[in-house]
Amino acid sequence: MLTLYGYIRNVFLYRMNDRSCGDFMKVISMKFIFILTIIALAAVFFWSEDKGPACYQVSDEQARTFVKNDYLQRMKRWDNDVQLLGTEIPKITWEKIERSLTDVEDEKTLLVPFKAEGPDGKRMYYGMYHCEEGYVEYAND
């Protein structure tokens, strides 16, 4: 027969076990969350991005097409160049793309020179095509 003392003792022990089990689960949960956070951060910072082709894998025609598309998109925002050339869609004349003869696989950037001509003028540009990153920087005369 269960006495009042036995009943209280059983409830107290149950609650103590429950509380310590809860504390144990909190510790496990915190460790689990911490480990997941570390894994997520590592994935974000160290996961290799999808990169474009290396420059030695890009043909001259592909480089010119990429630079031309990028240039024509940017021309819409380059008011000074539009005024100088007299058009947003100039005629483009390509120069020779110089490639490295010694360290072909280490080449990170292709220099793509071209001339843009419009009804009001012409301008020489040098597109620096960063192949793997997939963007172009420009310089002009």
UniProtKB/Swiss-Prot annotation:
UniProt entry keywords in alphabetical sequence: Bacteriocin immunity, Disulfide bond, Plasmid
Domain named YebF/Cmi: residues: 51-141
InterPro entries attached to this UniProt entry: YebF/Cmi_sf (IPR038703), YebF/ColM_immunity (IPR025603)
One Pfam entry name: YebF
Source domain of life: Bacteria
GO biological process: bacteriocin immunity
Disulfide cysteine pairs (residue numbers): C55-C131
Function in brief: This protein is able to protect a cell, which harbors the plasmid ColBM-Cl139 encoding colicin M, against colicin M.
Name the record gives this protein: Colicin-M immunity protein
Species of the source: Escherichia coli
